[in-house]
Amino acid sequence: MAKKTERAFSCVGCGYVHPKWLGRCPECGEWNSFEETPSLSSGDVRAVKKASSSPVQAFPLCAVRAQDAQRISCGIAEFDRVLGGGAVRRSAIMIGGEPGIGKSTLLLQIAAACGKSVLYVSGEESPGQIRGRADRLNIPIQNIELLCATRVEDVERVLNTRCPTFVIVDSIQTVFSPEAGAIPMTINQLKYCANELIAWVKERDSVLFFTAHVTKDGNIAGPKVVEHMVDTVISFERNEEDIRFLRALKNRFGSVDELGIFTMGENGLSAVQDTAGFFISTRQGMFPVGSATVPVCEGSRVFMVEIQALTVPAKSSVTRVFSDRIDSARVSRVAAVIEKRVGLKFSDQDIYVNVAGGIRLYEPAVDVALAMALYSARQNTPVKTNAAFIGEVSLSGEIRPVRRLKTRLKTAYGLGFSTIYVPIGVEHDTPPPYTLRVVGTLAQTIAEIFSKAKA
């Protein structure tokens, strides 16, 4: 009697599996994203269990010798910074970004700069296209071997022959195996091929890089299980111009706080050397209405950022917040605190918030500067150019301390910001002609700033 294979349906967006077809995925919320995928029959499951029943032994953790991660420089200091000091041997690194952002350019520059043996596997471009890009970038390619293949078995066969230090796959969505089904780019194909390649580097002192497509929401396409399988997930973002940002979303061997900043030009990606003042403009006198500055921490770096706000009367009974660089929930919360604790009404206004330079801000230390920008926009009164603001705003209107305050102050002073507003409890020797203003509440800060501005 033939074995009965159970039916299963999986979401093409996130990999969620359900025994029945669903119109909307309960995990990621996508509509009409379920496709039927074959699942193992009960006989197959028993066969797998039997095959994997070899004896294993447990051992005490205290008997294991600790090992430091062995890192290899990728040849690009800014990329090494994001990884935590270089790529770790036997690790898998996934880079996600929208089409045309520069993923292939970055990996080709890494392949040329690392000084190690590299196998570059391309499933999207022809050899002539890749050579043309290398010539445009004017990079050395003597250590790079190229393989244009999409079957994972072919890739593994070449890997076993060459044993390169760096393995680059562009992209993982184009690799397939007949063992995982007849249709490429399915959930099963992604999981199977990623697992095969990761298993290969885990057994050797190599490093695996592969690119991944992103969805229209900016999330990495494919099942989340692939992100769990790799050691590092790096997001490749851009602003409206030629600036690129590299940010680690997951890093088993380092911090996820570091930010890499590049500019895209004729010669490819170039690291920004002076990041402290990269996102602000030199001005004299007053800032434009609705602008305020804050020193922001990203990993070991501190740089000044200008927050811009605009308020207009709402055109309907439902007000809206437009902010894609700062979480809109944070903007709404700060506006609500101003309305409650200061008495300035925002509930009848549409709010627009932007960050100059296009960088995304996540830390709470931007709250006070955001509040100053919102108040300035609502009152149509500018803030002094040489003033900067540091602090988190609580729901009670208090200004709370933030981490690495001394480093933030040093950066702000170095860029000519002579008056810094900080939370209560800060002890710092302020060199002349700089002024450190200690404030306890948002209402106190607003009263001091804007009473002087009006005067």
From Swiss-Prot:
**Which positions form S-S bridges?**
none
Q: PROSITE patterns, from UniProt?
A: RECA_2 (PS50162)
Q: What's a BP term from Gene Ontology annotated to this protein?
A: recombinational repair
Check the record and name the Pfam families matching this protein.
Answer: ATPase, ChlI, Zn_ribbon_LapB
Q: Which GO terms describe its molecular function?
A: ATP binding; ATP hydrolysis activity; ATP-dependent DNA damage sensor activity; damaged DNA binding; zinc ion binding
Give the residue interval(s) assigned to the motif RadA KNRFG motif.
Answer: 250-254
Give positions of the C4-type zinc fingers. Answer: 11-28
Q: What top-tier enzyme class does this entry carry?
A: hydrolase
Top-rank taxon, per record = Bacteria
- Which residues does the annotation say bind ATP? 97-104
Query: Matching Gene3D superfamilies, A to Z?
Result: 3.30.230.10, P-loop containing nucleotide triphosphate hydrolases
Work out whether the entry's keyword set contains Cell membrane: no
> Mind telling me which CDD domains this protein's record contains?
RadA_SMS_N
Q: Where is this region: Lon-protease-like?
A: 350-455
Question: Which Gene Ontology cellular component terms are annotated?
Answer: cytosol
What's the EC number here?
3.6.4.-
Q: Which UniProt keywords apply?
A: ATP-binding, DNA damage, DNA repair, DNA-binding, Hydrolase, Metal-binding, Nucleotide-binding, Stress response, Zinc, Zinc-finger
Domain note for this entry?
Has a putative N-terminal zinc-finger, a middle region with homology to RecA with ATPase motifs including the RadA KNRFG motif, while the C-terminus is homologous to Lon protease.
PANTHER family in the cross-refs? DNA REPAIR PROTEIN RADA, DNA REPAIR PROTEIN RADA-LIKE PROTEIN
Please give the function described in this protein's UniProt entry.
Answer: DNA-dependent ATPase involved in processing of recombination intermediates, plays a role in repairing DNA breaks. Stimulates the branch migration of RecA-mediated strand transfer reactions, allowing the 3' invading strand to extend heteroduplex DNA faster. Binds ssDNA in the presence of ADP but not other nucleotides, has ATPase activity that is stimulated by ssDNA and various branched DNA structures, but inhibited by SSB. Does not have RecA's homology-searching function.
Q: Give the protein family.
A: Belongs to the RecA family. RadA subfamily.
Which HAMAP family does the record match to this protein? RadA_bact
Query: What is the designated name of this protein?
Result: DNA repair protein RadA
Which species? Treponema pallidum (strain Nichols)
By which gene is this protein encoded?
radA
